[in-house]
Regions:
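Catalytic machinery of carbohydrate-active enzymes
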Residues: 1-250
Length: 250
């Protein structure tokens, strides 16, 4: 692609979806080698965006509510003022599609996403039933990007030796989206799995944050051999642990 392009990639969250988007991030950078590429993401993932090497700039999306009109005006001013030549909306949510509307009827750049009227719309009616990796690959194919590599966190560097137990271990991550509890596997199933792993000489390592503290404590009580690292790991450290683990379930 031509040098001098200004590209915006939208990927807000959540954690799992952000990781799955690393393949598309790499593909977009390879497709636009001379472009200035900006990532719009949540503050929680901004540091990753700055470190991964695919972006020249990272914008933090504070996701202003409808009661903050001046914040929305500022958001629109920043988007329009950047003079983007193409946008890859990998979030493909109602909110990110609304960002397309902020450019106005005549000022929108080329746009890969689901917004009605955009130049490279992914209009597959079955897209919501596709796996994220396949869905994003098809979306980028519509925009002319044929090859999308597998997700990768190889650029993350963190030491796990101070956290990892001796011998074989497996990561158990019983948390999930707080507003979609139905997606979570029941804690008693994690406890049963932890017992099975421990019986095989594999230490269950429990991962989670403050919202999962109760669940982790419940599993740890049921399986004394488990190592509860709840609240003690950064995202980088979790990735480092995962590289050394025999398995991960979550």
């Amino acid at each position: 692609m031509a040098a001098g392009e200004r590209i915006l990639v939208i990927k807000l969250g959540a954690l799992g979806d952000w990781v799955l988007a690393t393949g598309p991030f790499a593909a977009i950078r390879r497709h636009h080698p001379g472009a200035r590429i900006t990532l719009l993401t949540l503050p929680a993932f901004a540091a990753w965006g700055e470190r991964c090497g695919w972006f020249d700039e990272v914008w933090r999306d504070e996701r202003p509510g409808w009661t903050r009109p001046f914040a929305w005006l500022g958001h629109r001013r920043r988007l329009v003022g950047a003079c983007f030549t193409r946008v890859y909306d990998l979030q493909t949510s109602d909110r990110s599609a609304l960002y397309y509307r902020l450019f106005g009827p005549r000022g929108a750049p080329q746009w890969s996403g689901i917004a009605a009227g955009c130049s490279h719309r992914h209009a597959n009616p079955d897209r919501d039933r596709m796996h994220t990796i396949e869905r994003q690959a098809e979306q980028l194919a519509v925009a002319g990007i044929a090859a999308v590599p597998a997700p990768s966190l190889d650029w993350l560097e963190a030491a796990a030796d101070k956290l990892a137990p001796a011998g074989d271990f497996a990561l158990l991550v019983p948390g999930g989206s707080a507003h979609r509890p139905g997606k979570r596997w029941p804690s008693e199933h994690y406890a049963a799995l932890a017992q099975s792993l421990a019986a095989r000489g594999i230490t269950p390592v429990l991962i989670g944050g403050a919202p999962e503290a109760g669940i982790l404590a419940q599993i740890a009580r049921a399986v004394p051999a488990a190592l509860d690292l709840g609240g003690r790991t950064s995202l980088d450290q979790i990735a480092a642990l995962a590289r050394c683990a025999r398995a991960a379930v979550g």
